Amino acid sequence: MLELVKVLGLFAITALAEIIGCYLPWLVLTQQRPVWLLIPAAVSLGLFAWLLTLHPGAAGRIYAAYGGVYVAIALIWLWRIDGVVPTRWDLVGSAVSLAGMAIIMLQPARSV
């Protein structure tokens, strides 16, 4: 179970790196923010790619499970950074995504 907690923490950090790496260019392209924001965006996306290499197990399975955590973190970003309160549909969708992640990660006799 401790291993699962570590993997979930790594998923959350990976999701933040991906979201930041995509959000900063979005700000530059749609909100006329300074172009220099593309530098930390590139660093964040590089960090995201590196973090993906730290996940144990088959890449496809890890990426599929990571998607569930990504959805939850993205909705937290929506709420805390964008200032938009998630709807109940957002929350249900996130719960379904997290349930899918749990099914993938907790399958019996998995090799992570």
Swiss-Prot record:
Q: Which parts of the chain are coiled coil?
A: none
Its transmembrane ranges are: 7-27, 34-54, 59-79, 89-109
The entry's localization annotation reads:
Cell inner membrane
Protein's membrane topology: Multi-pass membrane protein
Provide this UniProt record's keywords sorted from A to Z: Cell inner membrane, Cell membrane, Membrane, Transmembrane, Transmembrane helix
Cellular-component GO terms for this entry: plasma membrane
Q: Which family does it belong to?
A: Belongs to the UPF0060 family.
Record's protein name: UPF0060 membrane protein Daro_2632
Q: Which taxonomic lineage does the organism of this UniProt entry have?
A: Bacteria, Pseudomonadati, Pseudomonadota, Betaproteobacteria, Rhodocyclales
